[in-house]
């Protein structure tokens, strides 16, 4: 005896130990009216073929119906242009040394100006431009007067490297 769970109810069928799945499908067709070729029988997590036999007594067989249609297998998308490589920032070893200078007496002086905003806190240096200092974190800009900057630094301003 096996239990057959259909869509609406559970059937009890007398099945011999050596009986194949095709004969079980025919018994279900007689009881329920579902054609044998549309039935899909599942037992122990796998679908049974018509030639399978040797189902245990008091086993539960699930009846599923054949479904029409289904989604097509999609093609893998082929891109015409290659992927754009992300820009990797250059690693500078001991970059902190650019922010400080040590004289012959051993005195440490800051080369860059620190940001005064309370949101940045200490240790955030501002970028040096020709006429201003700029904080990349809080976007604070301090404009430097060109007359005083030229007098203190001894340079005329303009682009670096050209003399």
Swiss-Prot record:
> Has UniProt tagged this entry with the keyword Ribosomal protein?
yes
Record protein name field: Ubiquitin-like protein 1-ribosomal protein eS31 fusion protein
Its domain of life?
Eukaryota
Task: Write one Pfam family the protein is assigned to.
Answer: Ribosomal_S27
Instruction: Give all residue intervals belonging to the Ubiquitin-like domain.
Output: 1-70
One GO process term, biological-process aspect = protein ubiquitination
- A single GO molecular function, which one? zinc ion binding
Q: Which family does it belong to?
A: In the N-terminal section; belongs to the ubiquitin family.
> InterPro entries in the record, alphabetically?
Ribosomal_eS31, Ribosomal_eS31_euk-type_sf, Ribosomal_zn-bd, Ubiquitin-like_dom, Ubiquitin-like_domsf, Ubiquitin_CS, Ubiquitin_dom, Ubiquitin_ubiquitin-like
For this chain, the site of the Glycyl lysine isopeptide (Gly-Lys) (interchain with K-? in acceptor proteins) cross-link is 70
Q: Which PANTHER family match?
A: UBIQUITIN
Q: Where are the zinc fingers (C4-type)?
A: 115-138
Q: Name one GO cellular component term.
A: cytoplasm
Keywords (A to Z) from UniProt: Isopeptide bond, Metal-binding, Ribonucleoprotein, Ribosomal protein, Zinc, Zinc-finger
């Amino acid at each position: 005896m096996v239990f057959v769970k259909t869509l609406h109810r559970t059937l009890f069928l007398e099945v011999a130990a050596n009986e194949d799945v095709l004969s079980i499908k025919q018994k279900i067709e007689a009881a329920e009216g579902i054609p044998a070729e549309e039935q899909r029988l599942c037992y122990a997590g796998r679908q049974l073929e018509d030639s399978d036999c040797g189902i245990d007594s008091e086993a539960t067989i699930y009846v599923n119906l054949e479904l029409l249609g289904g989604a097509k297998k999609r093609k893998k998308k082929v891109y015409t242009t290659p992927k754009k490589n992300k820009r990797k920032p250059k690693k500078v070893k001991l970059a902190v040394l650019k922010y400080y200078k040590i004289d012959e007496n051993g005195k440490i002086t800051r080369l860059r100006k620190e940001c005064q905003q309370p949101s940045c806190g200490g240790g955030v240096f501002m970028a040096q431009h020709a006429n201003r200092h700029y904080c990349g974190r809080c976007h604070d800009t301090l404009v430097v007067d060109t007359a005083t900057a030229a007098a203190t630094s001894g340079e005329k301003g303009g682009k670096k490297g050209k003399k």
